[in-house]
A protein has these predicted regions:
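A short beta-sheet element
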Residues: 103-104, 123-184, 189-203
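Short, hydrophobic secondary-structure boundary micro-motifs
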Residues: 188, 261-262
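Non-catalytic DNA-recognition/assembly elements of restriction-modification systems
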Residues: 1-36, 43-85, 207, 211, ...
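Short, contiguous acidic/charged loop-to-helix segments that flank catalytic cores in large enzymes
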Residues: 119-122, 151, 164-166, 212-215, ...
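Sequence-specific dsDNA recognition surfaces
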Residues: 52, 68-91, 100-131
């Protein structure tokens, strides 16, 4: 037991270090986003106009656009069928199976321990995840925003969250950071209802109006910000690898199947 505890403890500093680095990188990305798209620091010499939206005065060549008019695929778990058909065709497992079933709680913990079998995965074809999508919680813990990780197994979207998959790559980080920030959260609050349980639906979400800079500015921003998120993804891969290794070793150490010398060798 003491050996198992020592092994568990030895991994914790590595987890915390990578998560601290990622938190710092996210803060850098948000600071850059705020500089460009909240304070408009690179564009202060341009002419502005009053947008009659939460975004206030914006540069003349920029636009306010409803999400439904953007090149973004938006879907959720229930898009795959009725509640009855979902109950009949989807089986969840807490042991490794064909594909990950990605939930809000998993994304928060960066630990993916719910699975579906191949039949379930194929039935949930409308909400298959490729990695890199924007995921937003729309029931209960409304407004939690994530970038979907890229895992080794196939992935499918869990319930109570929606996914956004921009058809133009340069939109991804812009939209992700917009919804992570104060204005984006306020926009989500504006379409959220419910007293016993807060929630919003896809239709109302698609009606949200966003500030859209010209394409050349979005592309330039994407080129600057992408290396930051590449590093974040590298650190997440390392966390995932360490988590998998820890979860494999600990049961064997506790049962006596594996000795600490076996690991060292």
């Amino acid at each position: 037991m003491q050996t198992a505890y020592h092994t568990y403890s030895s991994y914790q500093p590595l987890f915390h270090k990578n998560r601290r680095i990622n938190d710092n990188l996210e803060q850098q990305a948000q600071a850059l986003f705020k500089s460009w798209f909240v304070d408009f620091e690179p564009f202060l010499r341009e002419e502005f106009f009053k947008s009659d939206s939460l975004f206030g005065d914006i540069p003349v060549e920029w636009h306010i656009v409803a999400i439904k008019d953007l090149s973004v695929y938006i879907t959720d778990y229930v898009a795959n069928g009725s509640f009855a058909s979902l109950r009949e065709n989807v089986r969840l497992y807490d042991k490794p199976n064909y594909a990950h079933f990605i939930r809000n709680t998993d994304l928060k913990a960066e630990s993916y321990k719910m699975y579906v079998d191949k039949h379930s995965y194929e039935f949930l074809s409308k909400s298959v995840l490729e990695g890199g999508e924007i995921i937003i919680s729309n029931v209960g813990d409304v407004g939690s925003v994530f970038l979907c990780p890229k895992l080794e197994k196939p992935m499918t979207l869990g319930n109570n969250i929606i996914l956004l998959r921009p058809k133009k790559d340069y939109l991804t980080f812009y939209l992700y950071m917009l919804f992570k920030g104060g204005i984006g959260q306020h926009l989500i609050d504006g379409v959220t209802g419910g007293s016993a349980q807060r929630k919003f639906n896809k239709t109302d979400f698609k009606s949200i109006k966003l500030m859209m800079p010209p394409v050349n500015i979005l592309i330039k921003f994407d080129r600057i910000i992408k290396p930051i998120f590449s590093k974040i993804e590298e650190n997440r891969d390392e966390i995932s690898r360490l988590t998998s290794l820890r979860d494999t070793l600990l049961p064997k150490l506790m049962s006596g199947e594996l000795k600490i010398n076996d690991i060292n060798n």
